[in-house]
Amino acid sequence: MSETINTAAQFPSFEKPTVQFNERGWGPCELPDTFKDVPYQPFSKNDRLGKICDWTSTSNNDKKYQNKYASSFGTGNQYSYYHEEDETTFHLVDTARVQKPPHQRGRFRNMRGRGGRGRNPRGGLNNHHHHGMTTLNGKNVKARDTRRGMGKKFGHRGPPPKMRESSVAVRADWASIEEMDFPRLIKLSLPNIKDGVDIATCGTLEYYDKTYDRINVKNEKPLQKIDRIVHTVTTTDDPVIRRLSKTVGNVFATDAILATIMCSTRSNYSWDIVIEKVGDKIFMDKRDHTEFDLLTVNESSVEPPTDDDSSCNSPRNLAIEATFINHNFSQQVLKTGDQEAKFKFEEPNPFISEDEDIQVASVGYRYKKWELGSDIVLVARCEHDGVLQTPSGEPQFMSIKALNEWDSKLANGVEWRQKLDTQRGAVLANELRNNACKLAKWTVQAVLAGSDQLKLGYVSRINPRDHSRHVILGTQQFKPHEFATQINLSMDNAWGVLRCIIDLVMKQKDGKYLIMKDPNKPIIRLYDIPDNTFDSDDSDDGEGDDGEGFQQVYNYANNSNKI
């Protein structure tokens, strides 16, 4: 059987290509379809594809014309190498040159010849003459400090901020009614609110000891631990407010609660206030066994304390320390003793009975009312800490508070022992920057109470690592209204914020509500909560409704109301 062999299939065929004839020049007349829309960039085969770093080349002495011998190819980014790995953990470093102030420009312009050979104009050794040693001139030192984190103020992306915890856990059965952001609250204003009118006055005050005005850094005085009872009673537990609510007012609160609401736009930490609406009356209360009465420390600082709870410099331990200092200082600067004169109000202290034999702190209570318009009458309990005898014989009531220094290095503050006597304004300005909310609250409380003076004490630790021993370094006094102007505190805005919240609650039905500052956002939220929320019967052994009880850290403060 014969097979036919195809000889044409054994040899490759040759097809004549199409040759374009260019009459006006050389090269193809048309671009092939395979090369259309392909970007082209001049390149050289000697160029590296993405050179990362070169540690072998010597520094170029001719810095003015250092690029005159460089290749002109490869200047684009078509052949650059890009690493596709996630780089979100890297921190950006600002390499922009900081402009010098006018008094530093041209300082070393005419000193180039003084350094000599092998030296820079400032006298330092140049690196290109000494390859075996590493020298740091002024620019390198600045760059090194920038890499170490000195340039955070230029917008570097540092580590993520620590998330703060909420003062109370929001439950699923709570209904959110309103969110009020700080930019909107700052614009509120309620002007022409007259001073409050006294309804009742209770308690006994001791006179201020003027010898504490002569204390300075060189003549410091130890802070004593005074065993006295301080009552921090909420609104609905006050027997005087219960009596007055039957005849006077329709909004009831304490000065601490009002100050928290009025200064809410300066707060960073979370806080909450319980509001009960019964008919046309509103009662503002604080929750039991909470940290509402603790004083914050460096709340408005650029770098607030973030240590863990085991450290004495944690936010909570610093708050307990500041509260302990404030209570003891306000009682130590008074003239105590049975032989000393005392100022007594019309009624005795409403929180102690006649058969109780306890030593109570010097506190005077003023129950005042304010007309806020639209038939809203506010009744609040305000406090005085002491009284001062004037040469004319008229008493001046005082609000006595204490600022505390814990560790100036960790707090990015100024050394009180170095600046307090000579630059007290700088110390106060630093405190206004770090504790803006706390100072604003004290000022509002003094204005509401009608205090004639706001006395501030400067108390510091004996040792920065010892949070149990303190000394008094000095005192300073202000008039509350003048101090409010000095710290840019607008009482019209404070009354406007309070009136906004009152109007919002007045529109709701009868029940229990809660306003809370968001722990990480400048927002205040209003919640509608069940009537049995935060009832004392639901908690045992002093634990709050959120399951976490208030526990004291200091051994000398086993009682939350005892100092």
Curated annotation (Swiss-Prot):
Q: What is this protein called?
A: Eukaryotic translation initiation factor 3 subunit D-1
Similarity section: Belongs to the eIF-3 subunit D family.
Q: Which organism is it from?
A: Drosophila pseudoobscura pseudoobscura (Fruit fly)
Q: Where in the cell is it found?
A: Cytoplasm
Q: Establish whether keyword Manganese is in the entry.
A: no
> Lineage of the native species?
Eukaryota, Metazoa, Ecdysozoa, Arthropoda, Hexapoda
The UniProt subunit note reads as follows: Component of the eukaryotic translation initiation factor 3 (eIF-3) complex. The eIF-3 complex interacts with pix.
Q: What is known of its domains?
A: The RNA gate region regulates mRNA cap recognition to prevent promiscuous mRNA-binding before assembly of eif3d into the full eukaryotic translation initiation factor 3 (eIF-3) complex.
Enumerate the residue ranges of region (Disordered): 98-136
Chain's role: mRNA cap-binding component of the eukaryotic translation initiation factor 3 (eIF-3) complex, which is involved in protein synthesis of a specialized repertoire of mRNAs and, together with other initiation factors, stimulates binding of mRNA and methionyl-tRNAi to the 40S ribosome. The eIF-3 complex specifically targets and initiates translation of a subset of mRNAs involved in cell proliferation. In the eIF-3 complex, eif3d specifically recognizes and binds the 7-methylguanosine cap of a subset of mRNAs.
One GO biological process term: cap-dependent translational initiation
